[in-house]
Amino acid sequence: MSLLEQVSVSKKANIYFDGRVASRSVFFADGSKQTLGVVQPGEYEFSTSQGEIMEVISGRFEVLLPETTTWQEFSEGTQFELAANVSFKIRNTAIAEYCCSYL
């Protein structure tokens, strides 16, 4: 199991898509932030306001990255990077978890 140490965690979850996606913000002493999220089965579109690295913690996602037409699969232990101010889609058939690091 991977641990995040010496952090502060937001008590209130970020809830999206009528509760089908939920995440918690994690704050580090150096001022950086990550979010840890759980995604119920479905298809969702997200937008970024800053660069992100999305790491799949459990399960798998199919991802339609910006400016692409082919879905790519990312499973536990893999990651993908997103630029600022882009939109992307994810879909999954079972509950999956992610960790988002902001660039």
Swiss-Prot record:
Coiled coil: none annotated. Keywords: Glycosyltransferase, Transferase. Pfam families: Ppnp (PF06865). GO terms for cellular component: cytosol. It catalyses: a purine D-ribonucleoside + phosphate = a purine nucleobase + alpha-D-ribose 1-phosphate; adenosine + phosphate = alpha-D-ribose 1-phosphate + adenine; cytidine + phosphate = cytosine + alpha-D-ribose 1-phosphate; guanosine + phosphate = alpha-D-ribose 1-phosphate + guanine. Transmembrane segments: none annotated. InterPro entries: Ppnp, RmlC-like_jellyroll, RmlC_Cupin_sf. Signal peptide: none annotated. GO terms for molecular function: guanosine phosphorylase activity; purine-nucleoside phosphorylase activity; thymidine phosphorylase activity; uridine phosphorylase activity. Its EC number is 2.4.2.1, 2.4.2.2. SUPFAM superfamilies: RmlC-like cupins. It comes from the Bacteria. Catalyzes the phosphorolysis of diverse nucleosides, yielding D-ribose 1-phosphate and the respective free bases. Can use uridine, adenosine, guanosine, cytidine, thymidine, inosine and xanthosine as substrates. Also catalyzes the reverse reactions. Belongs to the nucleoside phosphorylase PpnP family. This is Pyrimidine/purine nucleoside phosphorylase. It comes from Shewanella baltica (strain OS155 / ATCC BAA-1091). The gene is ppnP.
